[in-house]
Amino acid sequence: MLNFLQSVQFVKEVEKKIIEYDKDIAFNEAIILYEIAKHDADLVKNLASTINQHYFKNTIELCSIYPAKVGLCPQDCKFCSQSIHHSCLIEIKDLAALDEVIEYLEYVISFPIKRFCLVTSGEKLDDSEFEKILDIYSHISKNYNILLCASLGFLTQERAKKLLKVGVVKYHNNLETSSTYFKNICSTHTQQQKIETLKIAKEAGLQICSGGIISMGEDMIERIKLAFELRELDVDSVPINILNPIKGTPLEDIKIIDKNEIFITLALFRIVLPKKTILLAGGKENALGDMEKMAYECGVNGCMVGNYLTTRGMGIREKIEMLESLDLKFQTNMHNN
């Protein structure tokens, strides 16, 4: 174990490697940073903040999602209230109509939100549903000034190209957890299927968004593995969700990891993925409460605002006021795609 002075020196060397030499850290270096964080968490959190400030200044990207289809999912992901394998009380919702989506979108665009994503339950949409969702995206793309993302399950090359054609710029599919822990979370599909979908999206010209959920019983080593696996895929943005244990799911009795461990996790993701958008997503209000502000000092430069798929988030206006109090500037769709 390094002493304090050795820890300070190691952190300085990592900072120089990333910022001055534009090099990625190795897995063993991330493990050493975690060991340092156990005793001197501020060293690692401050490093993450320095890296974030170097690449993103004091800007933050906001996105909002709309649950365009909810429930009746045949997959058995242990965290999810939408699975038919679990006994959760949620409102089942068929594919949304255009006017429903537009009503929410027009509320969203009254705020400085950069991205808007339609999310559907299930392995994938059937052909009829997919054509309807294409029509919705086409209408939004032609009439509204917001970047469009999609989270519609597994993809084919043909579908990826169609999404790109109607104005979608980014495709989302979470790895959820590390490759070695995934078997503990889901048995009805493989993580490799998710990876293939991300590769298909990328090959078609879409940006890719993929992250995971922390506090599902995994340890920090598994989280670090996930960060490196996402780096290997060269994802563009990384949503980090914190488990919100939902009654009726197999994970309903899990105790959420403590706040400091969450902050260290976020910091390590920033250090491993220095140039990517690290987005604080679902579960943040439940897990962090008033301490959510501290997450944005640990390398986070993105925030999902509004409600989630089946759980409520903080009101958009309230969230934006909180972020403004931190002197953060909101990215627009002029800040790259």
From Swiss-Prot:
<comment type="subunit">
    <text>Homodimer.</text>
</comment>
<dbReference type="GO" id="GO:0009102">
    <property type="term" value="P:biotin biosynthetic process"/>
</dbReference>
<keyword id="KW-0408">Iron</keyword>
<feature type="binding site">
    <location>
        <position position="209"/>
    </location>
    <ligand>
        <name>[2Fe-2S] cluster</name>
    </ligand>
</feature>
<keyword id="KW-0479">Metal-binding</keyword>
<dbReference type="Pfam" id="PF04055">
    <property type="entry name" value="Radical_SAM"/>
</dbReference>
<feature type="binding site">
    <location>
        <position position="149"/>
    </location>
    <ligand>
        <name>[2Fe-2S] cluster</name>
    </ligand>
</feature>
<keyword id="KW-0411">Iron-sulfur</keyword>
<keyword id="KW-0808">Transferase</keyword>
<keyword id="KW-0093">Biotin biosynthesis</keyword>
<dbReference type="InterPro" id="IPR010722">
    <property type="entry name" value="BATS_dom"/>
</dbReference>
<feature type="binding site">
    <location>
        <position position="77"/>
    </location>
    <ligand>
        <name>[4Fe-4S] cluster</name>
    </ligand>
</feature>
<dbReference type="GO" id="GO:0051539">
    <property type="term" value="F:4 iron, 4 sulfur cluster binding"/>
</dbReference>
<comment type="function">
    <text>Catalyzes the conversion of dethiobiotin (DTB) to biotin by the insertion of a sulfur atom into dethiobiotin via a radical-based mechanism.</text>
</comment>
<feature type="binding site">
    <location>
        <position position="117"/>
    </location>
    <ligand>
        <name>[2Fe-2S] cluster</name>
    </ligand>
</feature>
<keyword id="KW-0004">4Fe-4S</keyword>
<comment type="pathway">
    <text>Cofactor biosynthesis; biotin biosynthesis; biotin from 7,8-diaminononanoate: step 2/2.</text>
</comment>
<dbReference type="GO" id="GO:0051537">
    <property type="term" value="F:2 iron, 2 sulfur cluster binding"/>
</dbReference>
<comment type="similarity">
    <text>Belongs to the radical SAM superfamily. Biotin synthase family.</text>
</comment>
<keyword id="KW-0001">2Fe-2S</keyword>
<dbReference type="Pfam" id="PF06968">
    <property type="entry name" value="BATS"/>
</dbReference>
<feature type="binding site">
    <location>
        <position position="73"/>
    </location>
    <ligand>
        <name>[4Fe-4S] cluster</name>
    </ligand>
</feature>
<dbReference type="GO" id="GO:0004076">
    <property type="term" value="F:biotin synthase activity"/>
</dbReference>
<dbReference type="InterPro" id="IPR024177">
    <property type="entry name" value="Biotin_synthase"/>
</dbReference>
<dbReference type="GO" id="GO:0005506">
    <property type="term" value="F:iron ion binding"/>
</dbReference>
<keyword id="KW-0949">S-adenosyl-L-methionine</keyword>
<dbReference type="InterPro" id="IPR007197">
    <property type="entry name" value="rSAM"/>
</dbReference>
<feature type="domain" description="Radical SAM core">
    <location>
        <begin position="55"/>
        <end position="284"/>
    </location>
</feature>
<protein>
    <recommendedName>
        <fullName>Biotin synthase</fullName>
        <ecNumber>2.8.1.6</ecNumber>
    </recommendedName>
</protein>
<dbReference type="InterPro" id="IPR013785">
    <property type="entry name" value="Aldolase_TIM"/>
</dbReference>
<feature type="binding site">
    <location>
        <position position="80"/>
    </location>
    <ligand>
        <name>[4Fe-4S] cluster</name>
    </ligand>
</feature>
<dbReference type="InterPro" id="IPR006638">
    <property type="entry name" value="Elp3/MiaA/NifB-like_rSAM"/>
</dbReference>
<dbReference type="InterPro" id="IPR002684">
    <property type="entry name" value="Biotin_synth/BioAB"/>
</dbReference>
